Amino acid sequence: MATELLKGVILTLNEARHIQACVESLAWTDGVVVLDSCSTDGTQDLARATGAEVLEHRFENYAQQRNVALDTVDAEWILFVDADERATPALAAEVRELIRACEETGWWVPRHNHIFGHLMRATGWYPDYQLRLLRRSAARYDSTRHVHEVVDLDGEAGYLESPLIHYNYETLQQFVDKQRRYLDYDVGILQASGTAPHLYTPYTQAVRHFWWRFVTLRGWRDTVWGALLSTLMAYYEMVKYLRVRQALRSDRKPETTS
């Protein structure tokens, strides 16, 4: 049986800039564990200096890192928080009250995303629910999903009202770099599903995605930031389908003989 009711867990890799503020925001838990992927920027020392327990495990994928935490952290409940996120006093009070006598085995946590310095109120970045508060004995991450992790939960999940604060993309370059890291994975998913885009598909998908974010998800509420992010994500959709189409065309080219 776990000796503590709730611990916060932070996955890190070179997060010296964020780690201390993140750990401090979890001071209300029964302990904070930093699961570090062999940082070289002093993240581990800074985490210890702020009162966190530090464990090290070489990074394989996000799902595996979270499963390592579920296997090793001694607590009945785990709240996963990223280094660029902060728990608020309101979230602390809500979580503490709920987990003492709830039937749910997991809780979806909303996030307030700050992107390019702007608090997003729509455009798909709010409420941006994440399944982060987990009863450790009832949760496992799908190890086949290397990004965009999926939790296999034994039981029902509820929804919290109080958000995490997420200091998301600060610059356009940071945004572009992260989307590039996701691109190969997302293209692979489309290819595995047998998706065969037509010539026009990348462009119609881009238009649909922009409409979905800016109109359906009310991105207009975020004014110029909603328009910018809707455009960037629409461009990402276009490139994704262009990549799939390009790969299909390459596969269909007949081999030449000399």
What are these regions (language model features)?
Residues 25, 36-46, 82:
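A conserved acidic beta->alpha catalytic loop
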